[in-house]
Amino acid sequence: LQLCRGRIGLNVEIKPSAATPALEAETVRLLREYGFDSSNCVITSQSYETLHKVKELAPEYPTGYILALGVGNYYDLPDADFFSVETTFITSGMVNAVHLRGKTVSAWTIDREKVATHMLELGVDDLITDKPDMVQDLLARNQQVDDSLIDFRDLLNALLHPEQPADSSDDAEETITDAVEDPEEFVDAA
């Protein structure tokens, strides 16, 4: 915890057993001692009872219910702020149902770019991966596309709703024609 403090956020998974009855309390104590709070730490577990204990001890920490199977009626569980679901069970309907309740979906384990892209298309909020470089590269490329689309939208708005004299309409028409005929070149130029 000392090495992580100030460098990265944590997703702490609690795996309770009969031999560790105070595991939730000890986990919360250590997180607080090392300066981890709700801004840089979430607590997850496959045990809903564990999440309930954490919320009683430290309601400020976001808690995630880890679901090996993304089926059932779990959306309204009060002690789960988000759901961590294996990618096979994530559907757009499930993501929408969770989002309608003001909660989020984390997908695990993302180790292929194709799977990461699919999860982003479904609207998941977080990608849990063993290959952070791959996910960072994908997110950076997606951001570049988003920025280009925003620039394109702004340019089209400026062309379609000019605040300049009407004599600039020939230029606007030519620019729109160029964009329609060769959108990739137009976006690259923007």
Where are these regions (language model features)?
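Short loop-to-alpha-helix "cap/lid" segments that border enzyme active sites
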Residues: 2-170, 182-189
